[in-house]
Amino acid sequence: RLVNEFRDYARLPAAELKSIDLNALVAEVLQMYASENARVPVRMELDPNCPRVLGDAQQLRQVMHNLLQNAQDSTESAGPGVEGSGVLIKTHCTDSARRVRLTVLDGGTGFPEHILKRAFEPYVTTKAKGTGLGLAVVKKIADEHGSRVDIANRVADGKVVGAQVSLSFAIENVVPV
């Protein structure tokens, strides 16, 4: 499994950026996570005012799958929690930033500080059976899209209540840098 995932990571093709509706892509991907028997429920909050973005739909599907699977794993391993503390994927657009933000939040235990600093490096993982390539692939695809990617622990009442990963994409009439 590790060899196959590394091969896929190493041979990731260049992104073919086209105009895409990120909200529609999120809704499409989420259909695979909508089962009543889902390990951890996944909710979505889509900003209806989001313009189209420049992206490679296939690669962005991969990003969403990696982030959603990680979020489900983390939330599940944290055990039963607060009602509604499942996984959330959302989009948000700010007019001033001229970018669309995609964020995945989980209800897990967050990342230890030493992992948080290196989370996007290959082979860094918190999972016993993880390969450590999921977030490395996310970072590589984000770079191909000229996207900023951020990862942070979510804190409430002084304790970590999960993690979040956010990517921001240029809207379609803005040339990527």
Predicted features, each with a name:
Residues 134, 138:
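Short alpha-helical Gxxx[C/S/T] motif in the catalytic ATP-binding
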Residues 16-30:
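A conserved beta-strand-to-alpha-helix junction within the catalytic ATP-binding
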Residues 84-88, 92-102:
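Short beta-strand-loop-beta element adjacent to the nucleotide/active-site pocket used for signaling
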Residues 41-51:
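Conserved catalytic submotifs in the C-terminal HATPase_c
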Residues 12-15, 52-55, 126:
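Conserved micro-motifs of the catalytic ATP-binding
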Residues 111-122:
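Short conserved segment of the HATPase_c
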